Protein backbone atom coordinates (compact mmCIF):
# COMPACT_ATOMS: atom_id res chain seq x y z
CA UNK A 1 0.00 0.00 0.00
CA UNK A 2 1.39 3.37 -1.04
CA UNK A 3 1.98 5.88 1.78
CA UNK A 4 -0.47 8.75 2.02
CA UNK A 5 2.40 11.22 2.01
CA UNK A 6 5.29 11.94 -0.35
CA UNK A 7 8.15 14.24 0.65
CA UNK A 8 9.74 16.19 -2.22
CA UNK A 9 13.33 17.15 -1.48
CA UNK A 10 15.68 18.67 -4.10
CA UNK A 11 19.40 18.69 -3.33
CA UNK A 12 22.38 20.36 -4.98
CA UNK A 13 25.84 20.27 -3.40
CA UNK A 14 24.16 19.70 -0.04
CA UNK A 15 26.55 17.16 1.51
CA UNK A 16 27.35 19.25 4.63
CA UNK A 17 23.72 19.67 5.72
CA UNK A 18 21.94 16.69 4.13
CA UNK A 19 22.59 14.06 6.85
CA UNK A 20 20.96 16.12 9.61
CA UNK A 21 18.09 17.05 7.29
CA UNK A 22 17.37 13.39 6.49
CA UNK A 23 17.65 12.38 10.16
CA UNK A 24 15.01 14.96 11.05
CA UNK A 25 12.74 13.32 8.49
CA UNK A 26 13.42 9.83 9.82
CA UNK A 27 12.54 11.01 13.34
CA UNK A 28 9.01 12.12 12.38
CA UNK A 29 6.18 10.80 14.54
CA UNK A 30 4.34 10.21 11.25
CA UNK A 31 6.21 7.15 9.97
CA UNK A 32 4.25 6.34 6.81
CA UNK A 33 5.84 8.43 4.06
CA UNK A 34 8.05 8.09 1.01
CA UNK A 35 10.71 10.69 0.24
CA UNK A 36 11.71 11.47 -3.34
CA UNK A 37 15.15 13.09 -3.20
CA UNK A 38 16.34 14.70 -6.43
CA UNK A 39 20.08 15.14 -6.76
CA UNK A 40 20.41 17.97 -9.27
CA UNK A 41 23.85 17.12 -10.62
CA UNK A 42 25.76 17.74 -7.39
CA UNK A 43 29.55 17.91 -7.59
CA UNK A 44 30.17 16.99 -3.94
CA UNK A 45 29.23 13.88 -1.93
CA UNK A 46 25.47 14.52 -2.03
CA UNK A 47 24.66 11.54 -4.25
CA UNK A 48 26.86 9.17 -2.26
CA UNK A 49 25.21 10.31 0.99
CA UNK A 50 21.75 9.78 -0.49
CA UNK A 51 22.52 6.32 -1.78
CA UNK A 52 23.92 5.26 1.59
CA UNK A 53 20.77 6.42 3.39
CA UNK A 54 18.48 4.82 0.78
CA UNK A 55 20.33 1.51 1.14
CA UNK A 56 19.41 1.46 4.84
CA UNK A 57 15.92 3.00 4.61
CA UNK A 58 13.73 2.01 1.66
CA UNK A 59 11.40 4.95 2.23
CA UNK A 60 13.92 7.06 0.31
CA UNK A 61 13.92 7.09 -3.49
CA UNK A 62 16.93 8.77 -5.08
CA UNK A 63 16.54 10.47 -8.46
CA UNK A 64 19.71 11.83 -10.06
CA UNK A 65 20.52 13.63 -13.27
CA UNK A 66 22.49 16.52 -14.76
CA UNK A 67 22.24 19.96 -13.17
CA UNK A 68 19.15 21.68 -14.59
CA UNK A 69 18.20 24.02 -11.75
CA UNK A 70 15.65 24.01 -8.97
CA UNK A 71 12.44 24.23 -11.02
CA UNK A 72 13.37 21.27 -13.22
CA UNK A 73 14.49 19.28 -10.15
CA UNK A 74 11.18 19.93 -8.41
CA UNK A 75 9.11 18.92 -11.44
CA UNK A 76 11.28 15.84 -11.98
CA UNK A 77 10.71 14.79 -8.38
CA UNK A 78 7.01 15.63 -8.45
CA UNK A 79 6.53 13.17 -11.31
CA UNK A 80 7.78 10.42 -8.96
CA UNK A 81 5.54 11.37 -6.04
CA UNK A 82 2.62 8.99 -5.47
CA UNK A 83 1.10 10.08 -2.14
CA UNK A 84 -2.17 11.96 -1.82
CA UNK A 85 -0.17 14.78 -0.26
CA UNK A 86 3.26 16.21 -1.11
CA UNK A 87 5.37 17.87 1.58
CA UNK A 88 8.23 20.12 0.53
CA UNK A 89 11.57 20.12 2.26
CA UNK A 90 14.96 21.67 1.52
CA UNK A 91 18.23 19.86 2.04
CA UNK A 92 19.62 22.37 4.53
CA UNK A 93 16.59 22.61 6.82
CA UNK A 94 15.38 20.57 9.80
CA UNK A 95 11.88 19.32 10.63
CA UNK A 96 10.36 19.31 14.09
CA UNK A 97 9.36 15.73 14.92
CA UNK A 98 5.64 16.47 14.65
CA UNK A 99 5.69 18.54 11.45
CA UNK A 100 4.32 15.94 9.03
CA UNK A 101 1.74 14.59 11.47
CA UNK A 102 0.39 18.04 12.37
CA UNK A 103 0.08 19.20 8.77
CA UNK A 104 -1.45 15.91 7.67
CA UNK A 105 -4.08 16.18 10.43
CA UNK A 106 -5.07 19.66 9.29
CA UNK A 107 -5.36 18.71 5.61
CA UNK A 108 -7.40 15.61 6.45
CA UNK A 109 -9.68 17.61 8.76
CA UNK A 110 -10.16 20.57 6.38
CA UNK A 111 -11.05 19.41 2.83
CA UNK A 112 -11.37 23.05 1.72
CA UNK A 113 -7.61 23.54 2.17
CA UNK A 114 -5.44 22.76 -0.84
CA UNK A 115 -2.22 23.25 1.11
CA UNK A 116 -0.87 24.11 4.54
CA UNK A 117 2.30 25.69 5.82
CA UNK A 118 3.61 26.15 9.35
CA UNK A 119 5.64 28.58 11.39
CA UNK A 120 9.43 28.59 11.36
CA UNK A 121 12.49 29.26 13.44
CA UNK A 122 15.29 30.75 11.39
CA UNK A 123 18.77 29.53 12.32
CA UNK A 124 21.62 29.91 13.17
CA UNK A 125 20.58 32.70 15.52
CA UNK A 126 23.99 34.24 16.30
CA UNK A 127 24.34 36.36 13.16
CA UNK A 128 20.66 36.78 12.34
CA UNK A 129 20.00 40.33 11.14
CA UNK A 130 17.25 42.52 12.52
CA UNK A 131 15.56 42.30 9.13
CA UNK A 132 15.47 38.50 9.18
CA UNK A 133 14.16 38.51 12.76
CA UNK A 134 11.39 40.90 11.71
CA UNK A 135 10.56 38.68 8.73
CA UNK A 136 10.37 35.65 11.04
CA UNK A 137 7.98 37.50 13.37
CA UNK A 138 5.81 38.50 10.40
CA UNK A 139 5.73 34.95 8.99
CA UNK A 140 4.82 33.55 12.39
CA UNK A 141 2.00 36.08 12.84
CA UNK A 142 0.13 34.51 9.90
CA UNK A 143 -2.16 31.87 11.35
CA UNK A 144 -5.11 31.32 8.99
CA UNK A 145 -6.09 30.96 5.33
CA UNK A 146 -7.65 34.43 5.46
CA UNK A 147 -4.39 35.95 6.71
CA UNK A 148 -2.42 34.15 3.98
CA UNK A 149 -4.61 35.87 1.37
CA UNK A 150 -4.39 39.27 3.06
CA UNK A 151 -0.59 39.17 3.24
CA UNK A 152 0.07 37.47 -0.11
CA UNK A 153 1.19 40.65 -1.89
CA UNK A 154 3.27 41.96 1.01
CA UNK A 155 5.80 39.13 0.92
CA UNK A 156 5.51 35.38 0.45
CA UNK A 157 3.40 34.52 3.54
CA UNK A 158 4.43 30.86 3.65
CA UNK A 159 8.02 29.62 3.87
CA UNK A 160 8.02 27.20 0.95
CA UNK A 161 9.93 24.37 2.69
CA UNK A 162 7.01 24.22 5.14
CA UNK A 163 4.39 23.61 2.45
CA UNK A 164 2.29 20.44 2.23
CA UNK A 165 0.00 20.32 -0.82
CA UNK A 166 -2.64 17.97 -2.15
CA UNK A 167 -0.82 16.17 -4.96
CA UNK A 168 -3.67 16.55 -7.46
CA UNK A 169 -3.49 20.33 -7.04
CA UNK A 170 0.30 20.48 -7.23
CA UNK A 171 0.38 18.30 -10.34
CA UNK A 172 -2.16 20.57 -12.00
CA UNK A 173 -0.07 23.68 -11.33
CA UNK A 174 3.49 22.33 -11.31
CA UNK A 175 6.53 24.54 -10.85
CA UNK A 176 7.53 27.06 -13.50
CA UNK A 177 10.39 29.46 -14.22
CA UNK A 178 9.10 32.97 -14.89
CA UNK A 179 12.28 34.75 -13.86
CA UNK A 180 10.98 35.37 -10.34
CA UNK A 181 10.88 33.12 -7.24
CA UNK A 182 9.23 29.80 -8.11
CA UNK A 183 7.85 29.37 -4.58
CA UNK A 184 6.13 32.77 -4.54
CA UNK A 185 4.81 32.10 -8.04
CA UNK A 186 3.28 28.80 -6.92
CA UNK A 187 1.67 30.35 -3.84
CA UNK A 188 0.09 33.16 -5.85
CA UNK A 189 -1.16 30.70 -8.48
CA UNK A 190 -2.73 28.57 -5.76
CA UNK A 191 -4.59 31.60 -4.43
CA UNK A 192 -5.51 32.90 -7.90
CA UNK A 193 -7.03 29.51 -8.72
CA UNK A 194 -9.33 29.89 -5.71
CA UNK A 195 -7.50 27.46 -3.43
CA UNK A 196 -7.18 28.13 0.29
CA UNK A 197 -3.80 27.74 1.98
CA UNK A 198 -3.90 27.15 5.72
CA UNK A 199 -1.29 27.30 8.47
CA UNK A 200 -0.40 25.09 11.41
CA UNK A 201 0.51 27.88 13.88
CA UNK A 202 3.47 26.05 15.39
CA UNK A 203 7.21 26.35 14.70
CA UNK A 204 7.67 23.02 12.96
CA UNK A 205 10.58 23.86 10.66
CA UNK A 206 14.07 25.11 11.41
CA UNK A 207 14.80 27.24 8.35
CA UNK A 208 18.51 27.68 7.70
CA UNK A 209 19.76 31.16 6.81
CA UNK A 210 23.08 30.84 5.00
CA UNK A 211 25.00 32.97 2.50
CA UNK A 212 24.72 30.13 -0.04
CA UNK A 213 20.94 29.89 0.08
CA UNK A 214 19.30 30.31 -3.34
CA UNK A 215 17.26 33.24 -2.09
CA UNK A 216 20.54 35.09 -1.52
CA UNK A 217 22.37 34.06 -4.70
CA UNK A 218 19.83 33.70 -7.52
CA UNK A 219 18.85 36.72 -9.67
CA UNK A 220 15.27 35.39 -9.54
CA UNK A 221 15.12 36.46 -5.88
CA UNK A 222 16.16 40.07 -6.48
CA UNK A 223 13.75 42.66 -5.06
CA UNK A 224 12.66 43.83 -8.51
CA UNK A 225 11.69 40.26 -9.44
CA UNK A 226 9.42 40.00 -6.40
CA UNK A 227 7.83 43.29 -7.49
CA UNK A 228 7.39 41.98 -11.04
CA UNK A 229 5.71 38.86 -9.67
CA UNK A 230 3.31 40.87 -7.50
CA UNK A 231 2.45 43.17 -10.40
CA UNK A 232 1.68 40.29 -12.75
CA UNK A 233 -0.76 38.68 -10.32
CA UNK A 234 -2.35 41.99 -9.28
CA UNK A 235 -2.90 42.87 -12.94
CA UNK A 236 -4.62 39.56 -13.64
CA UNK A 237 -6.51 39.56 -10.33
CA UNK A 238 -7.89 42.53 -8.39
CA UNK A 239 -6.93 45.02 -11.14
CA UNK A 240 -8.11 42.91 -14.09
CA UNK A 241 -11.51 44.60 -14.66
CA UNK A 242 -10.09 48.12 -15.21
CA UNK A 243 -7.02 49.92 -16.51
CA UNK A 244 -6.87 52.29 -13.54
CA UNK A 245 -6.65 51.94 -9.77
CA UNK A 246 -5.89 53.98 -6.67
CA UNK A 247 -2.35 53.73 -5.32
CA UNK A 248 -1.97 54.48 -1.60
CA UNK A 249 1.65 55.32 -0.90
CA UNK A 250 4.33 56.75 -3.14
CA UNK A 251 7.49 55.87 -1.31
CA UNK A 252 10.12 53.54 -2.72
CA UNK A 253 7.82 50.49 -2.75
CA UNK A 254 4.91 52.41 -4.27
CA UNK A 255 7.06 53.86 -7.04
CA UNK A 256 8.50 50.45 -7.93
CA UNK A 257 5.07 48.82 -8.00
CA UNK A 258 3.60 51.60 -10.16
CA UNK A 259 6.38 51.07 -12.73
CA UNK A 260 5.84 47.30 -12.72
CA UNK A 261 2.07 47.64 -13.14
CA UNK A 262 2.51 50.00 -16.10
CA UNK A 263 4.06 47.07 -17.98
CA UNK A 264 0.65 45.38 -17.67
CA UNK A 265 -1.29 48.44 -18.84
CA UNK A 266 -2.38 49.45 -15.33
CA UNK A 267 -1.92 53.07 -14.21
CA UNK A 268 -3.02 54.88 -11.05
CA UNK A 269 -6.00 57.20 -11.49
CA UNK A 270 -5.22 58.72 -8.08
CA UNK A 271 -2.40 58.52 -5.56
CA UNK A 272 -3.20 58.74 -1.85
CA UNK A 273 -0.61 60.53 0.25
CA UNK A 274 -0.44 62.00 3.74
CA UNK A 275 2.37 64.39 2.75
CA UNK A 276 0.74 67.84 2.78
CA UNK A 277 3.22 69.17 0.24
CA UNK A 278 2.03 66.65 -2.35
CA UNK A 279 -1.75 67.04 -1.95
CA UNK A 280 -3.42 68.51 -5.02
CA UNK A 281 -0.38 67.98 -7.22
CA UNK A 282 0.05 65.52 -10.09
CA UNK A 283 2.43 62.56 -10.07
CA UNK A 284 2.82 61.16 -13.57
CA UNK A 285 -0.59 62.57 -14.39
CA UNK A 286 -2.34 61.14 -11.31
CA UNK A 287 -3.82 63.66 -8.84
CA UNK A 288 -2.60 63.27 -5.26
CA UNK A 289 -5.54 63.04 -2.85
CA UNK A 290 -5.98 62.57 0.89
CA UNK A 291 -7.53 59.42 2.39
CA UNK A 292 -10.70 61.38 3.16
CA UNK A 293 -11.37 61.68 -0.60
CA UNK A 294 -11.41 57.93 -1.19
CA UNK A 295 -15.18 57.37 -0.71
CA UNK A 296 -15.73 59.68 -3.71
CA UNK A 297 -13.83 57.22 -5.88
CA UNK A 298 -15.48 54.04 -4.66
CA UNK A 299 -15.40 51.36 -7.33
CA UNK A 300 -11.74 51.80 -8.21
CA UNK A 301 -9.57 49.04 -6.71
CA UNK A 302 -7.07 50.27 -4.12
CA UNK A 303 -3.49 49.03 -3.83
CA UNK A 304 -1.85 49.95 -0.52
CA UNK A 305 1.90 49.96 -1.15
CA UNK A 306 3.40 50.85 2.22
CA UNK A 307 6.38 49.00 3.69
CA UNK A 308 5.83 49.11 7.46
CA UNK A 309 3.56 46.69 9.35
CA UNK A 310 2.18 49.35 11.70
CA UNK A 311 1.34 51.84 8.92
CA UNK A 312 -0.40 49.02 7.01
CA UNK A 313 -2.39 48.13 10.13
CA UNK A 314 -3.53 51.74 10.49
CA UNK A 315 -4.43 52.01 6.79
CA UNK A 316 -6.40 48.76 6.92
CA UNK A 317 -8.34 50.08 9.91
CA UNK A 318 -9.01 53.41 8.19
CA UNK A 319 -10.23 51.74 4.99
CA UNK A 320 -12.44 49.41 7.03
CA UNK A 321 -14.03 52.38 8.79
CA UNK A 322 -14.77 53.89 5.35
CA UNK A 323 -16.57 50.70 4.33
CA UNK A 324 -13.88 49.23 2.08
CA UNK A 325 -13.44 45.47 2.27
CA UNK A 326 -9.96 43.94 2.12
CA UNK A 327 -9.49 41.55 -0.82
CA UNK A 328 -12.70 42.78 -2.48
CA UNK A 329 -11.92 46.52 -2.60
CA UNK A 330 -8.25 46.74 -1.67
CA UNK A 331 -5.07 44.78 -1.09
CA UNK A 332 -1.82 45.55 0.68
CA UNK A 333 1.34 45.13 -1.38
CA UNK A 334 4.79 46.02 -0.09
Please provide the spans of the model-predicted regions.
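N-proximal low-complexity "stem/linker" segments adjacent to membrane-targeting elements
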Residues: 1-24
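Conserved donor NDP-sugar-binding/catalytic core segment of glycosyltransferases
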Residues: 98-133
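Conserved nucleotide-sugar donor-binding catalytic segment
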Residues: 7, 79, 135, 141-218
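Glycine-rich, basic loop-to-helix element that forms the pyrophosphate-binding segment
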Residues: 65-81, 102
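Short, acidic, metal-binding catalytic loop of nucleotide-sugar glycosyltransferases
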Residues: 23-32
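Short aromatic/hydrophobic "clamp" motif used to bind/position activated sugar donors
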Residues: 86
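Hydrophobic, well-ordered beta-alpha structural blocks that scaffold small-molecule cofactor pockets
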Residues: 153, 183, 187, 205-334
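A conserved acidic beta->alpha catalytic loop
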Residues: 39-48, 90
